[in-house]
Amino acid sequence: MEDEVIRIAKKMDKMVQKKNAAGALDLLKELKNIPMTLELLQSTRIGMSVNAIRKQSTDEEVTSLAKSLIKSWKKLLDGPSTDKDSEEKKKDTAVTSQNSPEAREESSSSGNMSSRKDETNARDTYVSSFPRAPSTSDSVRLKCREMLAAALRTGDDYIAIGADEEELGSQIEEAIYQEIRNTDMKYKNRVRSRISNLKDAKNPNLRKNVLCGNIPPDLFARMTAEEMASDELKEMRKNLTKEAIREHQMAKTGGTQTDLFTCGKCKKKNCTYTQVQTRSADEPMTTFVVCNECGNRWKFC
C-alpha cells in the first residue's frame, strides 16, 4: 500500500513541476479509496503532494476533492478529541491545527521529517515546528513580511515543497524584529539582505533549505552574509584568503634583488622577486615582486 501511495505522490510531483495537472482527478480518486493511516502520511508525505496539486489546479472538482482528502487526513494528525465543543473546533480547523497540543507534539516527535506537516486548513498544509508568528499592525513590518514571502516564491520551489511562504516570511520577520526590537535602518538592512539572498539565482539551495525547514526561521534571521553565500562563492572566498596568506608569507621569506622589473607606481627598478609554484607542476611558476623603494607589490605568471 505504501508503494502505491508513493507512486501516486511521484506522479503528482511531476505534474506540479510540469505545471500540467491533467490526470490529477484520477489519482485523487485512487487515494480516496486507499485507507490512510498516520504512519502512511508521515512516510510518504502524500499530503504535501496533494496540497501542491490543489494550489496549482484550476479544476474545481480537483481542488474540491483535494481539500476533502486533506481535511480527512488532518483528523489523523489531530487524533481523537474528547472536548465537548469538538463540533465548534471542526468549524475552525485553521486555528486548532496550529494550536492543538497534538499537532505540536507530532511536529516535535518526527525527527527525520521537515517542519512541514501533512495537515491543513482550506488554505494550505504547511505547519512549521515554530509557533505561528504574531500578527502586527505596523505598516513597515507588514511590508517586510510581504517582501520576504515574495522572495520565498522565487522559482516556484515553494509549490513543489508545499510550504506556506507567507507564514514563513512572517516568522523570519518576527525573528528579526525580536532581535532588533525596532524598524530602524539596521532592521531594514537585515530584511533586505535576507531578500537578496533568497532571490539569488546562483544560490537556490539556500531558498530550498529555508522552505523545507532545514534552516529554521530564527536561524536564517541571524545568518551572516558569509553563512548565506553559495558554495561557489564560499570556495572563491576561501581561495582568495589562501592566496592572500601565501603572498604575505612570500614577502617575509625574502627573495632575489633585481633591476629587471620596473615598478608601476614609482617607476624605479629596485625590486625583489620570489618565484613560487602555485599551480600544477606543468604550468608556469608565479613571480611575486616587491618594490624596495615604495613597497608596491605585484605578481605575474
Swiss-Prot record:
Presence of the UniProt keyword Aminoacyl-tRNA synthetase in the record: no
Gene Ontology cellular component terms for the protein in this record: nucleus; transcription factor TFIID complex
Annotated GO biological process: positive regulation of transcription by RNA polymerase II; transcription elongation by RNA polymerase II
Residues that bind Zn(2+): C263, C266, C291, C294
Chain positions with N-acetylmethionine modification: M1
Family: Belongs to the TFS-II family.
PANTHER family in alphabetical order: TRANSCRIPTION ELONGATION FACTOR A PROTEIN 1, TRANSCRIPTION FACTOR S-II ZINC FINGER DOMAIN-CONTAINING PROTEIN
Protein name per UniProt: Transcription elongation factor A protein 1
The organism of origin for this protein: Bos taurus (Bovine)
